[in-house]
Swiss-Prot record:
It is found in: Nucleus. Keywords: Chaperone, Nucleus. The gene is CHZ1. Residues 1-16 have a biased composition (Polar residues). Its main location: nucleus. Forms a chaperone-bound H2A.Z-H2B complex that acts as a source for SWR1 complex-dependent H2A to H2A.Z histone replacement in chromatin. Belongs to the CHZ1 family. This is Histone H2A.Z-specific chaperone CHZ1.
Amino acid sequence: MSSSVTDPTNAQNTASDAVAASTVDKGKGKSTEIADESMESVDDEEEEDDDDDDDEVEEDDDEEEETFEEIDPSAILPTGRRTRGVRVDYTSKEALAKAGLTGNEHDEDDDGDTEMN
């Protein structure tokens, strides 16, 4: 004798009944699961907790004042013009005079015609 607990045919029927109860029949091969609202309420509670944490972080940002200790004010151009993209000619007479050089100087290392005995 078998009881309803140990009867294999009874276990199959209860499993298929549970699947049928959790889905809505929409036709052949098209079924939609019934939403489990207990999981959604847990997600909502977590989102509310996350929002509280964000507010605390934003308050900290508001309290901090920006200091310009790292920025050298003398490096800021008063006209607001930018120096990027400006072509500089280092070979012009004006640039050489500013550096204290003349255009005829040669480096000793660059001479390739020097013979060594």
